[in-house]
């Protein structure tokens, strides 16, 4: 079994991605700085707005150019015609599959964001399909939380493997 090894992660560049304008992106960035005060002002904050990309490939190129340590965004970017319930949206879905950069997915969606409030982050959920041996993702979660916060580690299985587990449990 691979053991977890803590490493202090320094988040130097944060990309705030929104489908709105520069004012909306900066306001969101200010809210995230309050939410993540230990990253706050020490990081270089870059703002990517809806007029800078028109499709997923455009956004991927921008992310490659700015090379952030953390991407902050909402579900369902640039999908105002949809009423999202159980989807990340095309942009976030592709970014999670093609980029190695951790993504801080904010509550709500781009069309209906939930306010972060004025408190610092008290809990982070790490979601991946292969958590074992992924120290970097867990260390990024630690970097986003204050002391005495909670981190949930969520391992997602595909349907085939999940059914196999259920069958094995059923035989016990």
Language model: regions and residue ranges:
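Small/aliphatic-rich secondary-structure junction motif
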Residues: 1-50, 120-172
């Amino acid at each position: 079994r691979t053991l977890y090894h803590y490493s202090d992660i320094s988040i130097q560049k944060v990309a705030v991605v929104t489908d709105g304008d520069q004012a909306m992106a900066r306001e969101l960035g200010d809210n995230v700085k309050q939410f993540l005060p230990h990253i706050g002002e020490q990081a270089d904050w870059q703002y990517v707005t809806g007029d800078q990309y028109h499709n997923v490939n455009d956004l991927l190129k921008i992310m490659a150019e700015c090379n952030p340590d953390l991407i902050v965004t909402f579900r369902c970017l640039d999908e105002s015609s949809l009423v999202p319930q159980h989807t990340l949206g095309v942009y976030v879905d592709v970014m999670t599959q093609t980029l190695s950069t951790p993504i801080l997915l904010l509550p709500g969606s781009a069309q209906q964001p939930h306010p972060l409030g004025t408190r610092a982050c008290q809990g982070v959920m790490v979601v991946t399909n292969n958590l074992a041996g992924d120290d970097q993702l867990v260390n990024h979660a630690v970097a986003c939380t204050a002391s005495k916060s909670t981190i949930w580690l969520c391992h997602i299985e595909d349907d085939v493997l999940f059914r196999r587990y259920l069958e094995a449990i059923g035989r016990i």
